[in-house]
A protein has these predicted regions:
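The beta1-alpha1 cofactor-binding region of Rossmann-like NAD(H)/NADP(H)-dependent oxidoreductases
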Residues: 58-68, 100
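Conserved glycine-rich cofactor-binding loop
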Residues: 15-16
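Active-site loop immediately N-terminal to the catalytic Tyr-X3-Lys motif
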Residues: 96, 143-149, 171-172
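Alpha-helical segment proximal to the catalytic Tyr-Lys
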Residues: 123, 167-171
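Substrate-binding pocket helix/loop in short-chain dehydrogenase/reductase
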Residues: 94-95, 99-107
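Residue(s) in the substrate-gating loop at a strand-loop-helix junction
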Residues: 138
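Active-site helix of classical SDR
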Residues: 118, 154, 162
Length: 185
C-alpha cells in the first residue's frame, strides 16, 4: 500500500466530487492535506468530517494572488510536496452560441490558473529538490464533446502544458502528470 506519511499535499477544487474523493484518499494514506475551494460551507463540512485537514478558501481565477497563495500554503503545511490541480469549470454552449466570456472564462480558470499554480509550486519544489504535480484533465480534452469546445480546448491545453513541464523538470526530481477522468456524477 502506498503511504503518503510526511507528504504535504495541496488539492484545489477539493469540495467537488473528484476533489472530495482525493481528499479522503490522501488522508487515508496518511498525507497532510490542504484543501481549497470557493464554497465556504463545503470547506467547513470537510473540516468537520476530517478535523486534521487544513482548509483554505481560495479562488484560483485571481492570478495576481496565486504566488501569495502558494506562499501561504507552504507556510501552513511547512512545505509542499504534491500539488493536485483539480479545480475547474464548465460553461457549456454550442460554439456558435458561445459568448466570448464563456470561452475566455473556461480557458482562464482551467488552463491559465493551472499554469500559474504549477509555476509557483515548482519554484517551491525546486528548493526541496522534490515535487509531484497531478493535473486533473478530462477525456473530453482527448475526444471533444458537443457543446464543450471551450472545456475541451482547456483540458487539451492542460495535457500539452503538463507534458512540457514534465520534460522541463524531470531532471530536477519533479514529475508532472495528468489524469483524464471520463464523465462523473
Amino acid at each position: 500500500m502506498i503511504n503518503f506519511k510526511g507528504k504535504k499535499i495541496l488539492i484545489t477544487g477539493a469540495t467537488g466530487g473528484i476533489g472530495n474523493a482525493l481528499v479522503k484518499k490522501f488522508l487515508s494514506l496518511d498525507g497532510t492535506v490542504l484543501a481549497t475551494g470557493t464554497n465556504t460551507d463545503k470547506l467547513d463540512s470537510l473540516k468537520k468530517e476530517f478535523p486534521n485537514i487544513n482548509v483554505l478558501k481560495f479562488d484560483i481565477s485571481d492570478h495576481s494572488k496565486i504566488e501569495d497563495f502558494i506562499e501561504n500554503v507552504t507556510s501552513q503545511l511547512v512545505g509542499l510536496d504534491i500539488l493536485v490541480n483539480n479545480a475547474g469549470i464548465t460553461m457549456d454552449n454550442l460554439s456558435l452560441r458561445m459568448k466570448d466570456e464563456e470561452w475566455k472564462k473556461v480557458i482562464d480558470i482551467n488552463l491559465n490558473s493551472t499554469f500559474y499554480l504549477c509555476k509557483h509550486a515548482i519554484k517551491k519544489m525546486l528548493k526541496n529538490k522534490y515535487g509531484r504535480i497531478v493535473n486533473i484533465t478530462s477525456v473530453v480534452g482527448h475526444t471533444g464533446n458537443l457543446g464543450q469546445s471551450n472545456y475541451a480546448a482547456s483540458k487539451a491545453g492542460m495535457v500539452a502544458m503538463s507534458k512540457s513541464l514534465a520534460i522541463e523538470y524531470a531532471k530536477k526530481n519533479i514529475t508532472v502528470n495528468c489524469v483524464s477522468p471520463g464523465f462523473i456524477q
